[in-house]
Amino acid sequence: MKYIILVLLCLTTSIVLGQDPIERPEKKNDSLSLGKKTKPINPKEKMENDSITLTIEDYKIISFERDTTYLDTTLTLQKEYKYNYLREDDFELMPFGNIGQAYNELGVDFERVGSYPNLGALAKDRKYLEREQIKYYNVATPMTELFFKTTLEEGQLLDANLAFNTSRRLNFSIGYIGFRSLGKYNDTQIESGNFTTTTNYISKNGRYTLRAHIAAQNIESEENGGLSDREEQFESGDEDFINRPRVDVLLDDANNKILGKRYYLDHQYKLVRTQLDSTRFEKTALSIGHSFEYETKYYQFLETSNDTLFGDAILSEIDDKAILKTFYNEANIQFYNKTLGKLVGGVNMYNYDYYFNSVFIEEDGTVIPNRLNGTEIGLVGDYEKRIGGFDFKADLRYNLSGELAGNVFNASASYSLNKNNKIKFSLHTSTRLPNFNYLLYQSEYLNYNWDNSEVFEKERASSLKGELFSKTWGNLMVKYSNLDNYTYFAPVSDEEIADGMDNAFIKPLQEGNTVSHLKVKYQKEFKVGMFALNNTVMYQNVTQDSQVLNVPQLVTRNTLYFSSDVFKKAMYLQTGVTFKYFTAYNMNGYNPVLGEFYVQNKEELGGYPLLDFFINARIQQTRIYLKAEHFNSSFSGYDYYAAPNYPYRDFVIRFGLVWNFFS
């Protein structure tokens, strides 16, 4: 609540400051200039008769990798694809019935971002913002962005962010994402809150730079276990059950939650620097740097009374809680030379403590410990260099001591053939242990207790990717991946498992043979006048000895849309229809106790179309969205599952807006 109050106060201030109108430039809808005369940011630096014209390039957004982009208030089809709860293109995902409930994967990637295992519960934490997802800002005047979208039944989604500079060298931002959706089916309510605040600073002489953020996040979901009579109450299309609260579900008193807090700091100091050359870049620089991160995170499953759906239980009331605390420190030195390139080398220390609140003793006397903890020490290295038209990048994370981490190596080379065509090749290799919930888990449910910390081997992933970016021919990506010791969840029993009882026998397993995965993705838009057809197609093929990795062979999304200025260019309009389809396959099942997906090979799901109709508009810096989602649900058959027993949502109309304003 204190975060919400703080954000509301900041937004109120920003709205008051933002009442000065920002003139719309007489250009096409690319919002390249704000066209506003304003005073310098720092009143102390004010000069007589001084005024400046602000452009969109005065509003910078800086990524974790320190890549800088500018505020974009255009209305494009890509913005339509990203206008959702995750605020990312969900082409390779299949959402569940309620917004934010879970997302089954239609496409998979094996690249590891970090060297260390995660807490787990991956089906529930897609909205949990990792440090690589936090953005930093540098803005000429205070900038506010409001993202709003309706949800299902009660609730809404609001993402508010305020960024402001107190001087040309110091920036602060504060953001809060508040979300609630009751859902159409019983006991599927989802609530989440993501509070973030950031700062970044550069000293007057440019030698010292700092950036930091704090994130406090929680995601809470009711769990209904899926439909109890799906043939009679869903697949039949019986009008008595079109009102979804009448549909019977398996659970009515269960929920799970993820809660985490993170503190992050990264700063550098230039020991040696030379004067700028004619291109305004330093010829040589030598810097030392330090980064720090402390995070606490837990996953909890609660149930007021146990259910046979998950097998036998020790206690009637279920309260399973896995906690992870991590502490990361890195010291590095960075050398830059215009001829030699940029080289970073350093050493890091990672301390972890993953634990439960009790020790579990099995009937045969086997003790399952309640804790995994230790310290890992490793080396880091990064290299960047541009040679002619080639851009080379490489990074290495190498573990010196410890049991968890392995090695991560990424390398890429890109080349611009001309202004319209670019190619890029990437290589990835990594080794590390699976996530903590595969290694150690404890639950009040007897079958959900295991210790694989001394049994499981490190997963080894490698991939080679080639990409073509062409304004003429479209964008093509081809990637081939190998994975050894692939780890997954699946039902395991010496006896035949009855239908609907998979969740009572879920165990973590590790595949001893190599799994190979081919992924080909192509995107191309055809345009004729004001009409356009945007196409994205993905093909996948898996080579494996056992059926442990299931993905659809083909996924396609095609959007036919119309774009034009209307009302004497006072509004820019986009409207169209999106078609999405994926071939039937053994879609992964969902497990509420773990908040994870598991492999099942009993039934194929998929092979159904999804049709959406949208009308979007842009007025100055405001984008308005209106969509009829899955409007074909009532006449294309009731077989649209997102996972076994979990249907996708029915036809629904939703609307919202994204509004940027300045002061």
Protein language model regions, located:
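Sec-dependent N-terminal signal peptides
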Residues: 3-12
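Sec-dependent signal peptide cleavage junction
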Residues: 15-84, 276-277
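Exposed, low-structure sequence patches enriched in small/polar residues
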Residues: 18, 114, 139-141, 258-303, ...
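Low-complexity, highly charged intrinsically disordered N-terminal segments
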Residues: 75-131, 138
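Short strand-turn segments of transmembrane beta-barrel domains in outer membranes
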Residues: 118-119, 126, 130-162, 183
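Transmembrane beta-barrel wall of Gram-negative outer-membrane proteins
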Residues: 156-178, 187-220
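Flexible loop and strand-edge segments within Gram-negative outer membrane beta-barrel domains
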Residues: 206-266, 297-307, 314-315, 322, ...
